[in-house]
């Protein structure tokens, strides 16, 4: 289990979302190391697989937006169109590359027009494997003299399984080999797909299991299995939906849009059932703030983020994902 139980309700866990991507390209070594130095309780790697079954950290399996793959002529013929979780995407996909091939790529800032300073670090760092991040956090815990956790997000599990890349056993093996499966350091496993969470829990990995919740739509794994009979995400956070999660998961992680909906009772309803509530993602830039909290200037300028975050904090959340860990630590612990 994670150590959220020991943290007061007015002091949620501060989780570095993909490291510290407000300052460095997401999922880069420097992004994670900066997040640890800024005092986060945990960092969040998103996990996808390569053709040869190596687990790497990327927000999605299509990598043209966050790497220089398009600049590699040797990979030009890998560009293709696929349907991932029901959506048609064109680009380059991790499952079409070996780890050795992907290790030749360099990371880029996803949103250079919003985060120009982060983009100045483009081209300097390699893609990381999950094992790399686990080792960075273990070493960082020793260096900084405190327990730091990992919130591992499993991406596109149903899709990868359809390709013969079953993520549950790959993750299980990686965590055990890295010394992260038996509670050595705080671990959360999260996904928008409940099926893979159940599979990992059945394997006996010591972790908190958190069900990710979008503001709209249905989970892809349940949509494949049940069609339109599958519960929507909104139905899942209603009282009856939360009842069905008790005993299966330790909590939920909801889009901040749901908590900014005035009058919602999601946190109170979940807490009444013994479920923790995390939320994602608190960012200070106008591009990501609700309209009422945006300030003057462009999309990359900071708006009245503290006012937005206050609406969320007052609801008693247990964990919050942030892109600027220094701001998150100062606000949510202050």
What is each PLM-predicted segment?
Residues 1-334:
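Phosphate-group recognition and catalysis centered on beta-loop-alpha active-site segments
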């Amino acid at each position: 289990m994670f150590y959220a139980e020991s943290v007061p309700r007015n002091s949620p866990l501060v989780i570095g979302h993909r490291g510290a991507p407000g300052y460095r390209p997401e999922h880069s070594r420097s992004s994670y190391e900066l997040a640890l130095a800024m005092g986060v309780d945990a960092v969040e790697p998103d996990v996808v697989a390569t053709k040869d079954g190596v687990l790497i950290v990327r927000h999605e399996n299509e990598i043209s937006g966050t790497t220089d793959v398009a600049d590699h002529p040797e990979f030009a013929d890998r560009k293709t169109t696929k349907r991932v979780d029901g959506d048609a995407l064109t680009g380059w996909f991790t499952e079409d590359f070996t780890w050795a091939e992907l290790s030749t790529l360099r990371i880029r800032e996803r949103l250079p027009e919003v985060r120009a300073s982060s983009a100045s670090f483009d081209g300097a760092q390699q893609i990381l494997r999950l094992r790399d991040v686990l080792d960075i956090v273990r070493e960082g815990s020793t260096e900084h003299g405190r327990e730091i956790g990992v919130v591992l997000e499993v991406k596109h599990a149903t899709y990868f399984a359809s390709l013969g890349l079953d993520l549950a056993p790959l993750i299980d093996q990686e965590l055990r080999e890295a010394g992260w499966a038996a509670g050595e350091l705080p671990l959360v496993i999260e996904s928008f797909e409940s099926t893979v969470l159940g599979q990992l829990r059945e394997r006996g990995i010591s972790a908190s299991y958190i069900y990710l919740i979008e503001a709209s739509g249905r989970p892809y794994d349940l949509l494949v299995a049940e069609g339109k009979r599958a519960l929507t995400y909104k139905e899942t956070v209603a009282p009856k939906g939360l009842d069905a999660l008790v005993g299966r998961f330790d909590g939920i992680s909801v889009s901040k849009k749901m908590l900014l909906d005035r009058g919602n009772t999601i946190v109170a309803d979940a807490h009444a059932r013994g479920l923790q509530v995390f939320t994602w993602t608190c960012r200070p830039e106008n591009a990501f703030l609700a309209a009422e909290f945006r300030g003057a200037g462009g999309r990359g300028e900071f708006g009245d983020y503290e006012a937005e975050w206050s609406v969320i904090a007052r609801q008693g959340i247990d964990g919050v994902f942030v892109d600027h860990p220094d701001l998150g630590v100062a606000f949510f612990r202050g």
